Regions:
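An acidic/histidine-cluster motif and surrounding catalytic segment
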Residues: 1-105, 109
Length: 109
């Protein structure tokens, strides 16, 4: 693992179809000076049907707009809908392959 005891815990942020909540969460993270030294992984699940498509697209566009504001940001757009539990489980496992610790957030926290 590349992590060590002196690095900040990376953040795994899970999003789906709530762009307003996601914006609030991202803005809150940016208020913390430590975010410049923190890895931010954002996992976006794919929409299930056309009812969620527009909101999911807004989430993707918002993340693209915010990507330049974070120094260490990786956005993972799922190619198929995994569902909340699988998206979170797989995302956490992916982060733990690179780091020894993690902070988990959802877009509405």
């Amino acid at each position: 693992m590349e992590g060590n005891k002196h690095e900040y815990a990376p953040i795994a942020l899970f999003a789906f179809k709530r762009p307003k909540h996601l914006k609030i969460t991202l803005d809150s993270l940016l208020l913390n000076p430590e975010i410049k030294k923190t890895f931010l992984y954002v996992f976006v699940d794919k929409f299930l049907d056309n009812n969620d498509k527009e909101a999911n697209l807004k989430v993707k566009n918002l993340l693209k707009d915010y990507s330049y504001k974070f120094q260490n940001m990786e956005i993972i757009f799922n190619k198929k809908n995994k569902g909340l539990a699988n998206n979170i489980t797989e995302g956490i496992k992916a982060v733990f392959k690179k780091h020894e610790k993690i902070i988990v957030l959802e877009d509405d926290i």
